[in-house]
Structures are given as C-alpha cells and as structure tokens.
Amino acid sequence: MTGTHLSGCPRVRGDSRPAVVVTDLDGTLLLSDGSVSERAVAALRAVAAQGTRVVFATARPAWSARGLLSAASGLGAFLVSSNGAVVSDLDGGGVRRIRAMTPATVRAEIAALGQRPWAVDREHDRLIGPGWPDILASGAGTALRVGDVPDGSPVLCLMVHIDSAAPPPALGVRGTVRWTSSGPGLLEVSAPEADKVSAVASVLAGLGIGWERVVAFGDAPNDTGLLAAAGLGVAVANASADVREAADALTACNDDDGVAAWLEGMCLCHV
C-alpha cells in the first residue's frame, strides 16, 4: 500500500483506484463555517462518475447531515450518521442498519458520568439535558429541553461535556456501551456496534468490496479506527496528533479543501 503526503499521486493497495471513498464531515470535508465547498462537491461528483462509491461518515445525526449535504445529492452515496448508529441512503433516506441504546442504559451512563451537561440524539430529534448550552453545530433542527431521558424512543448517541483540559478518557467499548469523541471536551456514548468501522463494514459487505479498496478521510478520535481499517487512511492537516500518527497519508486542512485536493489527484492519476 502506498499513500501520498500532501502532494503526489494518491493510490491505494495495488496501485488501483479506490472502490469506495469514506469521508468524515466536520473538520474534514466541511469548511470551518460548516459548509461544503463547490470544489468538494465537484470532486465528489467526479469520483462518483468514475464508479467510486461515496460514504459520508459523521457524528452528526442524519437530519443534520442531510441538510448540509443537499448539494451532493444524486451521488448514490451512503450516510453513516450518529457515529455509526445509523446507516442510510443519502438521497432516499432509507435506513439500512441501526444500533441504538435503551433510555435506561443512557440514564445509567449519565449517572455514572457525574451528571455532567448532556444531550441525546434520537432518530428524529435531539433532547437537551440540564446545563447543556446549545444544540451544537447541527443545523436548524429543534431540540426539546428535558430534565431526564424519557422512556420510549431508543437513543442513538449520548453527548456529554467533559473537561477539555483534563487527560482524555480511554475510548472504546466499556461494558454495554462504546465511548468515542469527535472533538475536545466532548464524550459520545453509543451502542457497542455503533461506530464508524462497523457501520462502514456493513456497507462494504453489501457492496462485496474489501477494506483494501477503501480510502478514508478524517480528523478526530472517532475517525482513527476508520483510517486504520481502510486500505489508505488520510488525515487532514488540521487533524489531532493521534489521528495524524495513525494515518497512512496527509492532505491539506479542511479549509484548504484537503479532501477535494486528494480526490482531484485521484481522478487525474487514474484515467
């Protein structure tokens, strides 16, 4: 397997064009203002036209991600949302896979974490607990303020504010849940199989494609496993240090359209 470091011809194992491109959104594909550039959309359309399948993999809930990716409709792309809790079709919205937690499990995690500020994403809405300051950067969706997690709808993701100055907690499966993080000061709790690797693996199984033909882009701890599993894992230049160390290759930062630059190189090198 060979990669590229900011420049050069990007290839995956066997010097072939990737069959699947997987990209994170915030801090990776998206600009810092939360938008998708015209350049990025054009690059995604170019690789899709060459037969490469596109997967967007994000911590955002599906309803937020779809709003941001409206310009990328028509790609036949897959959407992995809520850190892998849901796999769906970007265009039609059909759900292919879902891994959720019971409200009782979430309440137990909140109690164990010391009643820090929290919010939860369910399939169609967000609930904000005591002390949570806003609804994050997840678009114009409404969020109901609650005192506790109610019974009823399963929970896709629990988000908890933690001290960003303290050493980060150990991430991974912890009993009946999985801990991950998409940014400093934020802990995300999901079902054990609600992670980007498991979710993308389900997409690949349906396509009959192996990981060796995947290129993945990311910037945060919740992308590390994905970059390690892919035939080529590419970190954007603004990625956290551990993600850059885990990656096979490095591209420009999100605000310099690093993903688009890499994809443009892929199109030019594999004609």
PLM segments and residue spans:
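Short amphipathic alpha-helices and their capping/turn segments at secondary-structure boundaries
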Residues: 3-15, 66-71
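Mg2+-dependent phosphoryl-transfer enzymes with acidic/Ser/Thr/Gly-rich catalytic loops
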Residues: 11-12, 16-20, 37, 190, ...
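Asp-based phosphoryl-transfer active-site loop
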Residues: 17-34, 56, 227
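Active-site phosphate-binding/coordination module
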Residues: 35-135
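Short active-site oxyanion
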Residues: 51-55, 75-77, 156-157, 212-214, ...
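Short, structured coil segments at secondary-structure junctions
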Residues: 72-75, 82-83, 114, 173-176, ...
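Short hydrophobic/aromatic-enriched beta-strand-loop microsegments
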Residues: 76-82, 99, 138-139, 179-180, ...
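Conserved acidic, metal-coordinating active-site core of Asp-based
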Residues: 113-229, 238
